[in-house]
């Protein structure tokens, strides 16, 4: 008895080839109303996590799907395909790297996402009448924010005399910086300055009320992290003291350095 895979009455064409051929017959892409929608979950992805491109399709007469990296339907950019009603449904392409999985409804799962995965993806829906449909979506990838820390030019300022500069470390892109004092958001004060990116906080004249604790928080589209609290040891120094922590010249130098790009809060 012959092999069940043999084709005695017609020429055999591998089903992977049929899928690719159908997807590349762009002249069959006649105008039609879109029936496919894609939800990206989540839209902003944390590096190392996973993302789902969830396909919603109202049409029942589908031959299969192809996913491409980028906006072009091109064989070199094909990630993976799926053919309905065939035992070997998944058809990885040149752009497949082992982390992508396609489901029977066309939904694409990408695991252990890297920054290189960010960008646009195109789904090519292949219908039985070869009137194809293309839908594009994109997502972004961010590293989860690290735990920040606070550095300072002076954790032991002299009351009503010393300038204190607090900086939230590290400096990262696509990050929002927030400050907390005594577990509350920073209050408006004429003695406080913030850099334009909120990363640096300046106390123009420290007082006993400025002891803290101080915390800084960094946020980005995929998370937030807060520093350990720090406190200031605000000291009182008599007028007769001969060795202030900061001379007038030093104070002026600090002010010139930190006020560049600063904004009053």
Swiss-Prot record:
Residues 243-265 form a propeptide. CDD domains: IgI_hCEACAM_2_4_6_like, IgV_CEACAM_D1. PROSITE patterns: IG_LIKE (PS50835). Residues 36-142 form the Ig-like V-type domain. Glycans are attached at residues 57, 85, 105, 112, 174, 183, 198. InterPro entries: CEA_cell_adhesion, Ig-like_dom, Ig-like_dom_sf, Ig-like_fold, Ig_sub, Ig_V-set. A lipid is attached at residue 242 (GPI-anchor amidated serine). GO terms for biological process: regulation of immune system process; signal transduction. It comes from the Eukaryota. Residues 1-35 form the signal peptide. SMART domains: IG. It holds the Pfam family Ig_3. Coiled coil: none annotated. Residues 146-233 form the Ig-like C2-type domain. Keywords: Cell membrane, Disulfide bond, Glycoprotein, GPI-anchor, Immunoglobulin domain, Lipoprotein, Membrane, Repeat, Signal. Its main location: membrane. Disulfide bonds join 168-216. One of its GO terms (molecular function) is protein tyrosine kinase binding. It is a lipid-anchor; GPI-anchor. Expressed in columnar epithelial cells of the colon (at protein level). Strongly down-regulated in colonic adenocarcinomas. Belongs to the immunoglobulin superfamily. CEA family. This is Cell adhesion molecule CEACAM7. The gene is CEACAM7.
